[in-house]
Amino acid sequence: LFKNFSFLLIGVIRYSAIEKYSKLYLKTHNHLIIKYFLMNFKPSNKSSSICRAVLGPTNTGKTYYALERMISYKSGVIGVPLRLLAREIYDRLVSIKGAEEVVLNTGEEKIRGKHARYWVCTTEAMPAGKSFEFLAVDEIQLCADEERGHIFTDRLLNSRGQFETLFLGSTVIEGLIKIIIPDIEIVSRDRLSRLSYSGKKNISKLGPRTAVVDFSVDRVYEIAEHLRTSK
């Protein structure tokens, strides 16, 4: 028993040392790793479709622009990071195209119209192996997120529409996008209105066209549920 425990302890120590060294190596040699990746990177699916990155701060109409582009095609898919946002976009598309032509797929919730042509999904739930004339991914700067970054990175590298692809997000990712997709068209968006602080408010008594922003996913759903029940 002691012998087996000793082997286990040595294994844990070795693993911890390797993990610590790996993190140190990544930290000190990050530029070399990126350089190696870029030298050896080859897109897995080359496409002749239009590819644009629409970049700018919040409240610049990026998502609205993507929806306008999507409904101009016979089929389309958009991936967004939040289920609530997916639901909002779904409702908007249903009001334009009708419920029979729209799909909502968030992993937890799936509503599929009888003649569905337009898909609204959380980024993780975007259908693999299905072709669309138009494809968009929102908040593409989440490529840098520790937990979900691999999903957004995969979409950036591999997901394309037949005729048009849009990546929406912050300007912080512009440099990386240009390196990965050299011929991409960058579209910059300016804020459409001015944001200002108006003091503390009672969240149950907010007026129409009020935006509630929280930086915790759990709090977003909690606030949304509170607003629904307080109406």
Describe the residue ranges of each PLM region.
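Conserved strand-helix element at the start of the C-terminal RecA-like helicase core
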Residues: S75-A86, G207-L227
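Walker A/P-loop NTP-binding motif
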Residues: T63-S75
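Walker A/P-loop
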Residues: S49-Y65
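Loop/turn-to-beta-strand initiation segments
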Residues: A116-Y118, S131-F134, Q162-L166
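Walker B catalytic acidic pair
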Residues: D138-I140
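Pre-Walker A adenine-sensing motif
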Residues: Y36-N45, Y65-L67
